Amino acid sequence: MTKENICIVFGGKSAEHEVSILTAQNVLNAIDKDKYHVDIIYITNDGDWRKQNNITAEIISTDELHLENGEALEISQLLKESSSGQPYDAVFPLLHGPNGEDGTIQGLFEVLDVPYVGNGVLSAASSMDKLVMKQLFEHRGLPQLPYISFLRSEYEKYEHNILKLVNDKLNYPVFVKPANLGSSVGISKCNNEAELKEGIKEAFQFDRKLVIEQGVNAREIEVAVLGNDYPEATWPGEVVKDVAFYDYKSKYKDGKVQLQIPADLDEDVQLTLRNMALEAFKATDCSGLVRADFFVTEDNQIYINETNAMPGFTAFSMYPKLWENMGLSYPELITKLIELAKERHQDKQKNKYKID
């Protein structure tokens, strides 16, 4: 059987660099190497692209994926053809955060006309920017908690007015978030104005735009969505925390979370969550994969929190576990995502690019 040629891209110039490497390790160890000839491209923290060809062995440690000593090559040269001498059947970007899941690298793949796994430029960019995402959810009629957003330059000029707006519109606790970052990097839970000021200072280290959201006493529920024009959603899972909130450290370092799959919810609530996840997928014109995150209160009020256009595939990750619960194994999920990438690229070839 002739193998298909796949290139996995990971690392990136982002605060989520190490998360991306951990995700790549998981995918490389799960992908069907009898079916796929796999090359990898590691993007350093400085933005250099380094390639290693024909990965066949198990990746024991993420240290093996820090290709710091390889030759930095031109991007177009790296993606022109695989180490087998044939064009890539698909590129699998496992990049998190800015410069990875925000539409930038998706635009590069579009220009180079290579099939790639996951969301396109528009859906990746709008899912990364929490303010734009919330505005699209609002247009779709999806219920959300109150929030405000502002820029670093606005805060530098109008700090007093912005703090007053937060205190007038929202009730503590509030969550301060960089608008364009994931994996809970830079997020703070604030119980008073002093903590709010510190949270704003922390978040502005990572982005020029912030979103401050109303806190709520609720369960954190997640739904995985898979597909292109006709997506499917899983039954919901729940994040059970042994911490104040689900931050970067608890997600990836401490392991102080448990995933309950499926979530213990009434069937009508589960169905509503699945339908809302599909609506969120459509609201941002997604393709491939999305994880939709919700809050569910004690009286079963549902609020959408966000969509994640490139959910992680680490040992703690909800997305693959939700599909395993639906009968789709991790290797099968990876194969399905590659097939969806090829399907979308084939559909794109139906477009005309010149007028007769």
Swiss-Prot record:
It comes from the Bacteria. One of its GO terms (cellular component) is cytosol. The keyword Nucleotide-binding applies. It is found in: Cytoplasm. InterPro entries: ATP-grasp (IPR011761), ATP_grasp_subdomain_1 (IPR013815), D-Ala_lig_Van_CS (IPR000291), D_ala_D_ala (IPR005905), Dala_Dala_lig_C (IPR011095), Dala_Dala_lig_N (IPR011127), PreATP-grasp_dom_sf (IPR016185). Gene3D superfamilies: 3.40.50.20, ATP-grasp fold, A domain, ATP-grasp fold, B domain. Mg(2+) 2 binds at residues 306, 308. Keywords: ATP-binding, Cell shape, Cell wall biogenesis/degradation, Cytoplasm, Ligase, Magnesium, Manganese, Metal-binding, Nucleotide-binding, Peptidoglycan synthesis. Pathway: Cell wall biogenesis; peptidoglycan biosynthesis. It catalyses: 2 D-alanine + ATP = D-alanyl-D-alanine + ADP + phosphate + H(+). It is an enzyme of class 6 (ligase). Its cofactor is Mg(2+); Mn(2+). Mg(2+) 1 binds at residues 293, 306. GO terms for biological process: cell wall organization; peptidoglycan biosynthetic process; regulation of cell shape. Belongs to the D-alanine--D-alanine ligase family. This is D-alanine--D-alanine ligase. It comes from Staphylococcus aureus (strain MSSA476). The lineage of its organism: Bacteria, Bacillati, Bacillota, Bacilli, Bacillales. The gene is ddl.
